[in-house]
Design a protein with these regions (language model features):
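Structural signature of the Rossmann-like NAD(P)-dependent dehydrogenase/reductase core
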Residues: 1-2, 86-89, 132-139, 178-183
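A short helix-coil junction within the Rossmann-fold of NAD(P)-dependent oxidoreductases
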Residues: 19, 77-78, 94-95, 121-130, ...
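Short SAM/SAH-binding signature in class I
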Residues: 82-83
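Substrate-binding pocket helix/loop in short-chain dehydrogenase/reductase
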Residues: 95-96, 100-105
Length: 188
């Protein structure tokens, strides 16, 4: 699960842990953040307390080498990958004039490119799983202008994730790999 050190990713991990799942926490947060609770290590402790097995890994999903190393560690520790949860996301609810290009690149790099990179790296292992899935935390692609108006850069980055789901669901269907999106809008 990418971005599972806190928030929705950690909540998904804790729910899976109650079913005894093996969970890789792939996130950048190894040290406590001054404003946001949770690290990969606190999440791992909570997962194990809930009944799961955890492998906390520092992974910046924008970095192909870190993604590849994380996937290799997951396979070595747990013997394979059955499901990938693309949860990591960068958010900036700002308009065009208020969004620096560095922030735009961050959102595109994490949300869209990072999800693509993680799916690509997990694909060989998903092909050999008994019931493989890719679950991406992404909204339904609704082109109503109201969803773009106040934060076009963020919406584009999240819709990139949505389009990955649509495309990869069709691409991977013959392989028996289910690809779905979940958008918990009532939580966010």
């Amino acid at each position: 699960i990418t971005g599972a050190s806190r928030g929705i990713g950690e909540a998904i991990a804790l729910r899976a842990a109650r079913d005894g799942a093996n969970i890789v926490i792939a996130a950048k947060t190894a040290e406590p953040h001054p404003k946001l609770p949770g690290t990969i290590y606190t999440a791992a402790k909570a997962i194990e307390a809930a009944g799961g097995r955890a492998l906390p890994l520092v992974v910046d999903i924008r970095d192909e080498a870190q993604v590849a190393a994380g996937v290799a560690s997951a396979v070595e520790r747990f013997g394979g990958i059955d499901i990938l949860v693309n949860n990591a996301s960068a958010i900036s609810l700002t308009g065009t004039a208020q969004t620096p290009l560095k922030r735009f690149d961050l959102m595109m790099g994490i949300n869209t490119r990072g999800s693509f990179a993680c799916t690509q790296a997990c694909l060989p292992h998903l092909k050999s799983a008994a019931n493989p899935h890719v679950l991406t935390i992404a909204p339904p692609p609704n082109l109503d202008p109201r969803w773009f108006k106040d934060h076009v850069a963020y919406t584009i980055a999240k819709y990139g994730m949505s389009l990955l789901v649509l495309g990869q669901a069709e691409e991977f269907r013959p392989l028996g790999i289910a690809v779905n999106a979940l958008w918990p809008r009532t939580i966010i």
